[in-house]
Amino acid sequence: MEGSKTSSSTMQVSFVCQRCSQPLKLDTSFKILDRVTIQELTAPLLATAQVKPGETQEEEANPGEEPFIETRQDGVSRRFIPPARMMSTESANSFTLIGEASDGGTMENLSRRLKVTGDLFDIMSGQTDVDHPLCEECTDTLLDQLDTQLNVTENECQNYKRCLEILEQMHEDDSEQLRMELRELALEEERLIQELEEVEKNRKIVAENLEKVQAEAERLDQEEAQYQREYSEFKRQQLELDDELKSVENQMRYAQMQLDKLKKTNVFNATFHIWHSGQFGTINNFRLGRLPSVPVEWNEINAAWGQTVLLLHALANKMGLKFQRYRLVPYGNHSYLESLTDKSKELPLYCSGGLRFFWDNKFDHAMVAFLDCVQQFKEEVEKGETRFCLPYRMDVEKGKIEDTGGSGGSYSIKTQFNSEEQWTKALKFMLTNLKWGLAWVSSQFYNK
């Protein structure tokens, strides 16, 4: 409900429909309410069913007890609660009417009237399931609904009456037959109850089995997931191992190719490359000798002598040859020969040049001793291969090499009292003899 004040002397009060919330204009009859009208509006609904005289006395004797009816067939107890009755006209729902107020009490009279009207609607709402007030349209709708419910109730009442008439018209035989059918139905009910109990037991057993099966299925799912993870891990390891295997196979093929290539490669020829560069004999691109027009550095000459000593030392070891009188000591560009008769005597196969070079004859003695070792190598080869012959004959006592296939001249391997041209040519012939010895050893010991 809502109210609004339009002036200081008048008040327009409007009520709202409790369904559609539309403002209402009350009928003028609400302004004049006597005691009888209020009692009719606020009186509760009374039971319309007539009560037998005997029952009336019983109810009057026990007004505080509630009627109790028990049906014999279904054993269901039903209780009827009558509606509340108006015990006195001076109950809590009564109103005290106020007479007409004077003009000075208009506002007070209007407030009281408003309170009475509001209380009246509250009482009406409490007596029924419908909230009041209602507008005309909502009232018509409510009446239509009540008419529908009334029709349904009347139809049900007619059906009950027909059933009651049929029951009253039934004979005793029909009743006995019905009782027999009832007993049969009761037996059938007991049988069905037993079957239901059996089914319930089976259901419990099946439920327990289902729970066990579900637990087993869950365990199997977990095992399957674990096996799947392990399978994935093994698959990953397999792929990695396959990659490693392919890599190793590729390495093996490459290593086999290199091995085949190395088997076909002569180690001595690959390690010691003897050739010539103009008038110089070279070993591994180091020139051995020097000319006035081409003053080769002594470091290069010493390195060439170191490679030459290493070559002869390797050939001797391959053949198992032990040199007499001297022992070769490969030591890079400071290689030397060690005298077997005098351990303290070392013959250096390197030189630094200068004035000392012309007066120091150890370098010459070392070259002659090396030529002696080459001669011993030649003699050792000739023991097993009589047809073996070096292109240049060597005279160890004189320290010379003869050009037997050419001019027939002899060239000293010493530097003292010798020209650089002849010394360089003698060294070139010596390298040529070593190349022939290298070729023979390679042919004899290639597969050994």
From Swiss-Prot:
Tree of life domain: Eukaryota
Principal place of residence: cytoplasm
Residue positions, PTM N-acetylmethionine: 1
Modifications made to the protein after synthesis: Phosphorylation at Thr-117 by DAPK1 reduces its interaction with BCL2 and BCL2L1 and promotes induction of autophagy. In response to autophagic stimuli, phosphorylated at serine residues by AMPK in an ATG14-dependent manner, and this phosphorylation is critical for maximally efficient autophagy. Polyubiquitinated by NEDD4, both with 'Lys-11'- and 'Lys-63'-linkages. 'Lys-11'-linked polyubiquitination leads to degradation and is enhanced when the stabilizing interaction partner VPS34 is depleted. Deubiquitinated by USP10 and USP13, leading to stabilize the PIK3C3/VPS34-containing complexes. Polyubiquitinated at Lys-400 with 'Lys-48'-linkages. 'Lys-48'-linked polyubiquitination of Lys-400 leads to degradation. Deubiquitinated by ATXN3, leading to stabilization.
GO cellular component, one term: nucleus
GO terms, biological process: apoptotic process; autophagosome assembly; autophagy; cell division; cellular response to glucose starvation; cellular response to nitrogen starvation; defense response to virus; early endosome to late endosome transport
Protein name, as recorded: Beclin-1
Gene name of the record: BECN1
